[in-house]
Structure formats: C-alpha cells, structure tokens
Amino acid sequence: MLATVGSLLRLRLGRIPCCAPGAPPEVERRPVASLWPRGHPQYSCGGSPGSSEPPGSAEKVHRVPAEHKPSQFDKRILLWTGRFKAMEDIPPRIPPEMIDAARNKARVKACYIMIGLTIIACFAVIASAKRAAERHESLTSWNLAKKAKWREEAALAAQAKAK
C-alpha cells in the first residue's frame, strides 16, 4: 500500500487534499477512485469514502446489532456482576457490549479481591514473623543449624569411610 502511494506521489498523480492544512483553495478536486488501485480503501475530504457525492446524500446504512450467544462462563459473569438476577433471566442472545462491560466489571472485582487477599497475607506474615522473633527463630539461626548438621553428617561419613 505504501509503495503504491509513494509511486503515485512520485509520478505527481497524487493531490493535496482540500482539507489539508495549508492547501490552496484553488486546488483541483479530482475523482479519488482514479488515483488508487482497485481493492484499497478510498478516502476523501467529503462524505463517504470513494464517492464524490456531498455528505448526507448517501442512503443511511441500517446496522443490525451483533448478537452473541453467551457461554456458561459468560452467564456466570453476568450473574456475578449483577447484570441479571437469575440464570433463567439471561436471554439466549445478548449484545457483545453487554458481555464486555460485565467482563470488565468482573476484572475490577477480581482485582479488588486480590488486593484484599494480599493485604490479609501481609498481616499474616507480619504476625507469624513476630511469633518467630519471640521464639528467637531467624534465618541466620536456621542456616547455622543446617550447616552444623551437614558438618556432623560429613564427619560421620568420614569416620565410616575410615573404618
């Protein structure tokens, strides 16, 4: 696409759009469709892409809202976030925006739960560390005891080997 646009500009087939800042008012308006290869989107300053009709003259496009069949997980999320009160209340097809909103709300709730659990875990670690300090337990004492045990085992192994 970029190579095509670059070659069009080098051949001076491109034009300065009428809506570009600094464009002179007498810029000739060529049909956009003749400048672009087939299959690529054609945009102009006016209304709809690729047409020279004034904006608003094109027929309105009737858009059918996309419907989505929710999975069991989606249904549980819709219930958990409070969108529906019971599983039977959930219609067979719902808009994807509703599912996205429910998922976002569920993400926020899950984050709040994790924040709460993290704070509770911090207090639990603080309490257990205070109890360990009262018993005079520390990582240093554990490491010294472990190394003393290893030395003792090594000495016993050396005595058994010497016999």
UniProtKB/Swiss-Prot annotation:
Family according to the record: Belongs to the UPF0389 family.
Any Gene Ontology CC annotation: membrane
Name of the protein: Protein FAM162B
Biased composition (Basic and acidic residues): 59-69
Membrane-topology annotation of the record: Single-pass membrane protein
InterPro entries, alphabetized: DUF1075
Protein's cellular compartments: Membrane
Provenance organism: Bos taurus (Bovine)
Keywords of this entry: Membrane, Transmembrane, Transmembrane helix
Positions of region (Disordered): 43-69
Paired cysteines (S-S): none
Transmembrane segments: 110-129
